[in-house]
């Protein structure tokens, strides 16, 4: 299934360190040549200061078991540089106590004043803290790096030349240490900064494209992520536009989120529209499954695509944990769509559509009825399932209306903002001539 593997594309939009989990995941699969994959990992890790990881990869490639002189020298240089940077930051090391109580500070200005008063804090110390945080990150010491990055975020002005780098670094470090709650906070902070910054159109598009890829790692690991990925990718026009323009392959992850999120079935209609619009630039078994089911009502095609979906998800680092849930919810979607067309269905027919044995299909339907998720009755003698009415709840109707209005409002707000910026620019340009 290498033709459906997105690792190569996704890695283009990820920090070097964020690619390592994806590449190591592929090592456990039989998609690519193991030797070539390890050689690529070695080539990538050589660009970092992770000497131990480099040696480990060399051993896996059956290279020399002893550390080459070049690596010995590099390790010594890394340790020396690290010690030098730590010495530069030493004057503010005692500020860790006040940093722990940072939440009690009203704002960053209060915090900086306290640092200047109690610890003789200077601007040079901030630059040193930033360099040390970056160096620790390059060495793979992500946990310690987050402490200094957090310090920089509190002390730095948003206008600082390194502020955006700190935001990206903090998000990457939190992802790599699996701190999903903090990562989500950093993701939101970074998104707000990008959306409000005075970037050019191209710069903003590039920043959002990178953020989209990084956010997938957070959304599929955070309890609230399944709702948030739909809100950001489908109902925020700026990000939907970035997906359609720069990375239509992200449709795989948006589609997966909608399938496994039963409370957001109202998003299906909007998702299908986008899938149809982008079908000429990107298609995979997951998007084709939804097309078969909701556009063509091709149940046989949907059944076959669902089988392919399982292989795709099994080999995708971002969504592999969703495999069982995806299959279960996809079967439910096939079942619900089939039931809208047929009021009386044979269990054998359903089993065929769901890729299940008849007795498994019957048990599956019984569990749906038992859990109050299906208004139906089973006639065991005839082997029939008789469907009741499935009314759309007022709550679902309200949510659908709100989502639609929210998307339109945000789109209009974006148009007004762009028009305002254009008018202001014309006004400034006109002023230059007088």
UniProtKB/Swiss-Prot annotation:
Belongs to the eIF-3 subunit E family. This is Eukaryotic translation initiation factor 3 subunit E. The keyword rRNA-binding does not apply. Keywords: Cytoplasm, Initiation factor, Protein biosynthesis. One of its GO terms (biological process) is formation of cytoplasmic translation initiation complex. Its main location: cytoplasm. Pfam families: eIF3_N, PCI. Residues 219-392 form the PCI domain. Component of the eukaryotic translation initiation factor 3 (eIF-3) complex, which is involved in protein synthesis of a specialized repertoire of mRNAs and, together with other initiation factors, stimulates binding of mRNA and methionyl-tRNAi to the 40S ribosome. The eIF-3 complex specifically targets and initiates translation of a subset of mRNAs involved in cell proliferation. The keyword Cytoplasm applies. InterPro entries: eIF3e, eIF3e_N, PCI_dom, WH_DNA-bd_sf.
């Amino acid at each position: 299934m290498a033709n459906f593997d997105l690792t190569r594309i996704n890695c283009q939009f990820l920090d070097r360190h964020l690619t390592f989990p994806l590449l190591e995941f592929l090592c456990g699969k039989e998609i690519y040549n193991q030797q070539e994959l390890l050689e690529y990992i070695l080539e990538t890790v050589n660009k970092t200061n992770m000497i131990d990881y480099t040696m480990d990869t060399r051993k896996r490639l059956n290279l020399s078991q002893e550390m080459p002189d070049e690596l010995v020298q590099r390790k010594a240089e890394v340790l020396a540089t690290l010690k030098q940077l730590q010495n530069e930051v030493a004057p503010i090391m005692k500020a860790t106590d006040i940093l722990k109580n940072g939440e009690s500070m009203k704002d960053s200005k209060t915090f900086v004043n306290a640092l200047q008063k109690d610890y003789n804090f200077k601007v040079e110390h901030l630059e040193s803290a930033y360099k040390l945080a970056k160096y620790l990150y390059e060495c793979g010491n992500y946990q310690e790096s987050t402490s200094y990055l957090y310090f920089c975020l509190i002390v730095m002005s948003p206008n600082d030349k390194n502020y955006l780098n700190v935001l990206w670094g903090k998000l990457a470090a939190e992802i790599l240490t699996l701190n999903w709650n903090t990562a989500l906070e950093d993701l939101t902070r970074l998104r707000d900064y990008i959306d409000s910054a005075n970037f050019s159109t191209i710069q903003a598009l590039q920043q959002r494209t990178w953020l989209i890829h990084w956010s997938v790692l957070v959304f599929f690991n955070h309890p609230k992520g399944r709702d948030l990925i739909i809100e950001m990718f489908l109902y925020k026009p700026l990000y939907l536009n970035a997906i359609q323009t720069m990375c239509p392959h992200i449709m795989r992850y948006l589609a997966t989120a909608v399938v496994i999120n039963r409370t957001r079935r109202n998003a299906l209609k909007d998702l299908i529209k986008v899938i149809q619009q982008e079908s000429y630039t990107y298609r995979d078994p997951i998007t084709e499954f939804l097309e078969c089911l909701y556009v063509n009502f091709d149940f046989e095609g949907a059944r076959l695509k669902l089988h392919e979906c399982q292989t795709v998800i099994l080999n995708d680092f971002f969504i592999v944990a969703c495999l069982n849930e995806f299959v279960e919810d996809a079967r439910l979607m096939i079942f619900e769509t089939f039931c809208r067309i047929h009021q009386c269905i044979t269990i054998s027919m359903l089993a065929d559509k769901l890729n299940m044995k008849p007795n498994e299909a019957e048990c599956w339907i019984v569990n749906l009825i038992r859990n109050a998720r299906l208004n139906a009755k089973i006639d065991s003698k005839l082997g029939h399932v008789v469907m009741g009415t499935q009314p759309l709840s007022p709550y679902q109707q309200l949510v659908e209306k709100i989502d639609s209005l929210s998307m339109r409002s945000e789109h209009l707000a974006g148009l007004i903002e762009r028009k305002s910026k254009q008018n202001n620019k014309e006004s400034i340009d006109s002023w230059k001539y007088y």
